[in-house]
Design a protein with these regions (language model features):
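ATP-dependent phospho-/nucleotidyl transfer catalytic cores
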Residues: 1-45, 57-146
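Hydrophobic HxD+1 residue recognition
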Residues: 48
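Conserved small/polar residues in nucleotide/adenosyl-binding loops
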Residues: 238-248
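A short linear-motif detector with a strong N-terminal bias
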Residues: 33, 213-214, 247
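Catalytic-loop signature of eukaryotic-like protein kinases
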Residues: 52
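Regulatory N- and C-terminal appendages and interdomain linkers associated
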Residues: 84, 89-240
């Protein structure tokens, strides 16, 4: 631990409990920010074992990783995890917290008051909530997340699962909506004949009112990518017969 802090976290020290607490809080915050970005773009790590996590808040050692196509919080690209789906998309924030708790357990002998390490877990929870709320605000085109926005996001998550909805296309198309009319998002749905039109139009009316009919489209486009590395794209790249094809 001393070597790690001395070489990678020179602003911290291990001389007392305060130093270790502040160091691990930085790890917790960086981890929370990383996972919020995963959730923003639909990235699924696939194998969130403790040894596949970085104390620098970096995405490493992603094995059977992937990006959501239809918005499905239960999806995982890891076929060995298909029965329990421990590392599914919607579970990633909780798994990151669990992994952080294991890190804190391993360093607890180094602190005089190990119960203080609970402060670090609380810091992760509050940090993730902040990053997650900011993420949703940016994806939906308003600058600040308000408590009443929780219901708007909750209803959106529900609607996205009513009929198979392409996550990437939906949020990118939302950037260009000019009126609260679900027909403008028609290309986002895999089964457009069964779209819950009434539910969507109610939600769009609420969203349109929230953004005062002027969503921050630049902010939305920054946070809603037009392209992600879809699984079929990765397969094409992997099976391309020549280096030239791979460059394409």
């Amino acid at each position: 631990v001393s070597h790690t802090i001395e070489n990678h976290f020179p602003n911290h020290n291990t001389e007392n409990d305060d130093g270790i607490i502040e160091w691990t809080k930085e790890i917790a915050q960086d981890t929370a920010e990383m996972v919020a970005h995963w959730m923003r773009v639909g990235f699924v790590h696939g194998v969130m074992n403790t040894d596949n996590m970085s104390i620098h808040g970096l995405t490493i050692d992603y094995g059977p990783y992937g990006w959501l196509e239809d918005y499905n919080p239960g999806w995982t690209p890891n076929t060995t995890d298909s029965s329990h789906r421990r590392y599914k998309f919607g579970n990633q924030p909780q798994i990151a917290a669990w992994n952080l708790a294991r890190l804190l357990e391993s360093i607890s002998p180094l602190v005089e008051e190990p119960e203080r390490l609970n402060e670090v877990l609380e810091h992760y929870i509050t940090s993730f909530e902040k990053y997650n709320n900011n993420m949703w605000a940016a994806k939906l085109g308003f600058s600040k997340f308000l408590p009443e926005d929780e219901e708007l996001v909750k209803e959106l998550n529900k609607l996205l699962q009513e009929v198979e909805t392409d996550m990437t296309i939906f949020f990118r198309e939302l950037c260009s909506v000019t009126a609260p009319d679900i027909s403008q998002l028609h290309e986002s749905f895999y089964d457009p004949e069964n779209i819950p039109v009434e539910g969507w139009n109610v939600w769009l009316e609420q969203w349109w009112l929230r953004v005062d009919a002027t969503p921050d489209r630049d902010l939305m486009r920054i946070n809603n990518p037009k392209y992600v590395l879809r699984n079929w794209m990765a397969c094409l790249l992997y099976t391309s017969p020549s280096p030239r094809d791979k460059r394409q």
